[in-house]
Amino acid sequence: MNRFTVRSKFIKFSFQLFRNYSVCLNSSKSLIRVEGVDAVKFLQGLTTNKITLDNPVYTGFLNTQGRVLFDSFIYPKVSNNGTENERSDELYVEIDKVAESDFLKHLKKYNLRSRCSIAKIPSEELSIKVIWDVKEESRLKDTVAYAKDPRFSKQRLLRMIVPTSTCTSSSSGSLDDYKVFRYRNGIPEGPQEIIPSISFPLESNMDWMKGIDFHKGCYLGQELTVRTYYTGVTRKRIFPFIIPNYEDNPSQVIEPSAPLSIVAKQGEPVSRRSPGKIIAILGKVGLALVRLQYLKSDLACNGIPIQLNTSIWLDELSSTPSENS
C-alpha cells in the first residue's frame, strides 16, 4: 500500500467522521398551523409540556386515560431577524404524516370556543429539516421556525421549518440515516414506535426526552401521568439495542412487536414471562420496550441475541423518582 492510498483512506475517513447529516422530512411529517389569540391557551390544555410563544417544545397529546395519542414538536414563528416573534399568535405543530387526519380531528373536537384557527400547511410550501452531528448551530436561509431537539442529551440535532424548495435541495442524508441516529440514541418517534392509545408517556421515555412539564396546569390525560410520576412505578422503558453478530448473518429476521426472551444460563430455570418486545429495528440497531427488572439479563428475540445500551439513559435511570419508588 503506497502513501497516496493511505492518505486517500485517511481523507475519506476524516470526511465521514466530521461531516454532518441533513434530511428533509417532507415525506414523513406534516405541519399544522394553529393561529389566534387563544392558540397558546388551546394547545396548553391538550399537551404534556408548557406551551409559550417564546420557545419550541417537544410534547405529547394524550387521551383521557393518559395514554399517548400523538408525539409532536410545537414551534413559535421566527421573526425576520431570526428571533422568536412574541407578537405573533402563530404556532406550528409538527406531526407524523400518517397521523395527520386523526390529529386534525382531535384538535377540532376540542376547539369549541377558542379564538384560533387550525389548518394544514401544504407540503409544497413548508417542510421539516433535521440536521445532526453538527459542531455549531446554523440555520438555513428563510427559516420559519427553529428548535434544538431536546430529546438528544448527548448529541446535537437541529430541527427547522423551511421552504420546501430549500429543504429538498440541500439534504445530505436519508430517512434511514435519521432513523439509525435516533435508534442509536434511544429515541422513539411517531405512531409506529409510540403506539397510539396503547403507549404510556413515561414508558415511552417522554419525561426523559423533556416532553413533560410536571408543574404546569391541567391538561387532557394529566391525572394518571402525574400520579404515576410522583407515587407510582414505571416498570418498562424503551432502550436502544444492537444485534452483536449481525454481520455474520444479516438475513436474521426480527420484526417490530416480536417478544423478547431471556437467555438462561446453564442450570437456571427459563422464565415464562417475556421481558419486553421489539419496538423498531433497522439493520443491526433498534429500540425495545424492556421491563426494568431484566436490564441486566441476557436477552434475545427469535433466538437472536440482542445487546441493550442502557448507558444512554444512565443518568435518567438513577434520578427518576418512579424508578426509585
From Swiss-Prot:
Gene3D superfamilies: Probable tRNA modification gtpase trme, domain 1 (3.30.1360.120). It is found in: Mitochondrion matrix. GO terms for molecular function: transferase activity. One of its GO terms (cellular component) is mitochondrial matrix. Its main location: mitochondrion. It comes from the Eukaryota. Keywords: Mitochondrion, Transit peptide. GO terms for biological process: [4Fe-4S] cluster assembly; iron-sulfur cluster assembly. Residues 1-21 form a transit peptide. InterPro entries: TrmE/GcvT_dom1, YgfZ/GcvT, YgfZ/GcvT_CS. Pfam families: Beta-barrel_CAF17_C. Belongs to the GcvT family. CAF17/IBA57 subfamily. This is Iron-sulfur cluster assembly factor IBA57, mitochondrial. The gene is iba57.
